[in-house]
Structure formats: C-alpha cells, structure tokens
Amino acid sequence: TRMAQNGCDVTCYNRAGHHVSGAEYDKTIEYDGIRQKVVPTIEKKGLAAVSSSFFAALCSAFGRYDVVHIHAEGPAFFCWIPKLFGKRVISTIHGLDWAREKWKFGVGSKFIRQGEKNAVKYADEIIVLSKDVQKYFLETYGRETHFIPNGVNRPEVREAKLITDHFGLEKDSYILFLGRLVPEKGIRYLVEAFKNVKTDKKLVIAGGSSDTDSFMEELKELAKGDDRILFTGFVQGAMLDELYSNAYIYT
C-alpha cells in the first residue's frame, strides 16, 4: 500500500473464491490504491494454488508492468512466464515450503521444490525473510539473496471490548497463539503442555487453516475436555489489535 501511496501503479492478482476475511469482501476491486484482479482458479485441494498461480503469471506476462513480484516457492514455479516476456521478476521466499509437513511427501513437495529452483534460475532478484534461508540459498545454489524481514505497523493499543463480547476475554486473562494452524508450528505441543498447567488463564489459538483442515480437527480433538482452550478462527483488524493488546503473554 505504501508503494501505491508513493505513486506506483500496483496490481494484485488473487485466486477466485471467497475472501479469507469473509464473503462481503469478494467484490472488492481496490484496497488502499491497489487494484485487485481475480484469476481463474480450479477449486480443488492441491489445484487451487497451482492454477491461480499459473493464470496470474500469464496475466502479468501480458500486462503493462515493469516488475512482477511473485510470493512463495510454489507460485515461483511459473516465474519463467513473465520473464519470457521481458518482465523484471522478483521472487520473495517466505520459507522452504517443500519441507513443510503438509507437503513433505508426494507431488506437492516436488512441485514446490522445482519452484524454488525456478526462482534461482529465472528471478532477477530473490528476497528472503530469514538469515537461515539466506544461508540455505547461498550454500545450496550459490545464489545471493536480499534479507528483508517482514515489516509491521506499530499496533494500536485497544481496550478489551470486541474480544469480551465475542469470546468473554478480559485483559491479562489469556495466553495468545496467533498464526496459521499448520503442524510445523508445534501447536499440538502447546496444547498438550497447556493442558498440564494449573492456571485459570485461557489459551487462545487464533488463526485459520492452510489446506490443513484435518490438522485443525486434530487440535480441537486434542483440546476437547479443557474449556480453557479457545479457537477463534481467522481474525484481523480491531479484533486482532485487541487480542494483542490484552494478552498476558503471546507466542
């Protein structure tokens, strides 16, 4: 959004289907100066990301853009398409996705790993979010990358209002975990450990799944019987600010 505020013409390609923030956002075509365009998507697990990434790469190749910025290793599989049409390509690697538990075996892992290799081969520049991943690319491929950690806005401190109305939470009454509910984040260990702690604090697990609905169900089954453990689902905006502002501790 700051690029748009500084005069850049920014377009974001998004997959079809309901917006993660809710169906009321489905028809939003502009956000803080950024145009959003929806690309065709095969609505089937394992194909939604692949198909939308392909069509986004194809559309960007034919668009009047100076730079095409591709995020994550899977979508980077198609970075050769805009490159073929003379676009300058930037790839941001958010992590070694092929090593994640949900992709560890089978075709998905191989596809994502090839996306990593394509980024190395075709991207003009690669951005990484951690020193460890930067070291990995240098040692594995001899490829220099740019280490740019994710930036955050300074959160606004808010009193507990929405979280009290929706979840019965008050200031310092809970421990907060916030993130995608995926196995490699170790959430099952957090739940198991918390169940053995004698405290009147609650454990709030805030976040949605990422093609990991079965893991979410596993977590809920693991938490069954302990009414101190609360799953909020995906949160954002004022609700998110309140969760941060009023947590006893968070991880």
Show which residues each predicted segment covers:
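Acidic donor-binding loop of glycosyltransferase active sites
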Residues: 124, 245-251
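Carbohydrate-associated surface elements
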Residues: 132, 151
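A short helix/loop element that forms part of the nucleotide-sugar donor recognition site in Leloir-type
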Residues: 24-26, 157-169
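An aromatic- and histidine-rich active-site surface loop
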Residues: 47-61, 65-98
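Nucleotide-activated donor-binding/catalytic signature segment of Leloir-type glycosyltransferases, i.e.
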Residues: 216-242
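Conserved donor-binding/catalytic core segment of Leloir-type glycosyltransferases
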Residues: 127, 168-198, 203-204
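Nucleotide-sugar donor phosphate/pyrophosphate-binding loop at the beta->alpha transition
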Residues: 51, 88, 99-118, 158
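Membrane-proximal helix-turn-helix segments that form the acceptor-binding/catalytic region
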Residues: 58-61, 84, 107-126
